[in-house]
């Protein structure tokens, strides 16, 4: 049995430390704004004219800011298993950097297991393999305390009259909220 070499699916975006992988972003030397993936041309802060950046390791943990599922296979160059298996995606807020980073959620954790505010940590997982290599990417994994908190949030949502799986508006109020937004824009 030969062992395949683990390599990053995308070079330079994260470390391959199995115990404590880190996303590699950049930080503007003028204003301190973080970016991921690394910025090399101009600062993403619209009030800054900075064009010099330092590599910046980003936080390994964060909280779910938003999430969804990928029911349809992403287009090439994405390498998917055959047959395609849907997966959850999470936009994770990194508090120290004041930014949100998108990534897949580990297999076995779906949208029903997530909620806004779920604590997650960065891990490495295989995206695909060939004869010689195992190509890895970062993924988000809920921490040990997340399932109980997720159940509490779902229970609270049901008590507030929210639809199962929808964290945004109580049943019957979606149209009302949209009308208010449209009315405000006309003024």
Feature-to-residue mapping (PLM):
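A broadly conserved sequence feature marking short terminus-proximal activation segments
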Residues: 1-27, 137-141
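Cys/His-rich short segments
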Residues: 18-59
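Conserved hydrophobic positions within beta-strands
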Residues: 62-64, 105
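Short, conserved beta-turn/loop elements at beta-strand boundaries and strand-helix junctions
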Residues: 67-73, 127
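OB-fold (S1/OB) nucleic-acid-binding surfaces
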Residues: 81-100
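Well-ordered alpha/beta subsegment
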Residues: 98-152
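Short, intrinsically disordered C-terminal tails of secreted or membrane-associated proteins
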Residues: 181-185
């Amino acid at each position: 049995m030969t062992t395949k070499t683990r390599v990053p699916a995308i070079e330079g975006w994260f470390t391959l430390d199995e115990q404590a992988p880190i996303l590699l972003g950049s930080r503007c030397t003028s204003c301190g704004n973080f970016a991921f993936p690394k910025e090399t041309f101009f600062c993403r802060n619209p009030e800054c004219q900075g064009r010099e950046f330092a590599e910046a390791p980003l936080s390994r943990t964060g909280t779910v800011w938003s999430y969804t599922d990928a029911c349809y296979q992403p287009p090439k160059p994405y390498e998917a298993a055959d047959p395609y298996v849907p997966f959850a995606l999470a936009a994770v807020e990194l508090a120290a950097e004041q930014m949100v980073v998108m990534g897949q959620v580990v297999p076995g954790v779906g949208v029903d297991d997530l909620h806004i505010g779920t604590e997650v940590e960065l891990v490495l997982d295989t995206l695909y393999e060939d004869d010689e290599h195992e190509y890895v990417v970062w993924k988000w994994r809920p921490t040990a305390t997340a399932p109980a908190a997720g159940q509490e949030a779902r229970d609270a949502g049901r008590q507030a009259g929210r639809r199962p799986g929808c964290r945004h508006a109580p049943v019957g109020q979606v149209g009302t909220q949209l009308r208010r937004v449209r009315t405000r824009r006309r003024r």
